[in-house]
Amino acid sequence: MSPDTVNNAVIDKAFEDNAPLRKRVYSAIASTPEYTSLFEDIAKYATTLRSGLGRDASSACSQVRVAATGEGPAAKKRKLINGSEGAVAGTGAGSANDAALLAGLTADAELQFYVQDLSFAIPQRKKLRLELTRLVSSAAGAREGYLRARNQASNEVEFGIPMSRIQHILCLPVPEKTQRQFNFCIIPEHGDGISPVPDHQLAFEPIVWTIPDGPPRTAYLGSGTPALESANLAETYESYLKRMLDDNLRHTKVICPSEKEFVSPTPEAHRKGDKAYHVKAFRGSKEGFLFFLSTGIFFGFKKPLVFFALENIDTISYTSVLQRTFNLNITARSPAKPDEVQEFELSMIDQSNHPGIDAYIKKHGLQDASLAEARRAKRLNINGVKGGDGGTDSAANHAGESEEEESELVKAQRELEDREDEEEEDYDPGSEGDSDGSGSSSEEEDQDGDGQEDYDGEGKDLVKEELGKMISPKPQYQQTYNG
């Protein structure tokens, strides 16, 4: 098909009050004439929305137009998408697909379920109606799902995201609340705080809403039937939304915290009977909460959210280790730009959480950069000054758990232990803790904290003394981990 066969009247009418967008549509048609019919269908649909469905639908269409062109106030531009430049500006199949996604977001589509009066925190702080719709594409016959938030007063779609553009969905308990609540966090493609948005590609914002712990009284099926009529007696907002979202997701599932992954030794501050799955931390001056999940590490709940997928984490190290707190440095690489390394520092983490975090790192085979040569000197200097932090020793406490994770120093210690076992057969282990306070090198403490934490049941550790002589003659006060 040639651009000469374009129905100019249809496109001109649909975009008569938006010349820049009309120009971009014509540019895209000229570059990819095979999508001419699709752009005409979109134009017809936009015209129908504006003229046939009333003021509210016209306003929703206007939001798409504002977002796509980058015009209007910043608050209005954020309503549907972020990084909107290039939503229809680019050329090729991507531009056509993005335009179709934007149109589908506000389309009068089949409603799967909805929940009234949900409290949203991101990208807007207000109560809205959550909807899950499914639209049949006329081009390929495919069914695309959309998760969107509708203003219950104006009936406008405020923002949303196609289900196919969701990278991760998390259901996390809200910390430090007297009543149990949960935050559902939608992490879109290129919205994890690490991956940059490719040029001329549509990007959606993360979405966060809060639900109470109780029966889903404001949830309804698409037909309007209350969800409670078909739900079991134990159904809650959490279980209902998790089930409905999982049923409509093809490439991911809702992820919740698990005690198998991480649980804080300190219970919830206002609910002593509930376990806490979060760790309080700071990123710069911004306070937030860390969650260690089966698919990655999440930091929220204030903008900007950051989600470190396990596959994107390069290294993890402990720095600024003090007697009561330590910092966690996460080095990550974006799949789109694997050569570019980004480093994130999460500070002021309580020492009591160190064993659980360290176990999480080891479990998932993440490189513990606190044992790396490049980090060792800085951390030892901190230890020498502070003289009493046990966090550094605990950071390396499990270094020998896996043969693949052992450094050359730990392997050397194992060999020395074997030799000492043969030479000291008459040695009586004695009571634990006899060697506390004895001089040992800071290098040896950094590599293996087993002796100083008295986990192995040994008394005076001759192996460590020998190893300390091999590594560094400089003594250091014995440290005790306070976790």
From Swiss-Prot:
Region annotation Disordered: where it falls in the sequence: 382-483
Composition skew (Basic and acidic residues), residue ranges: 408-417, 457-468
Keywords: Chaperone, Chromosome, DNA-binding, Nucleus, Transcription, Transcription regulation
Pfam family, one: Rttp106-like_middle
GO MF term set: DNA binding; histone binding; nucleosome binding
Statement: the UniProt record of this protein carries the keyword Protein biosynthesis: no
SUPFAM superfamilies linked to this entry: PH domain-like (SSF50729)
Family: Belongs to the RTT106 family.
Name the UniProt record assigns to this protein: Histone chaperone RTT106
Organism this protein belongs to: Ajellomyces capsulatus (strain NAm1 / WU24)
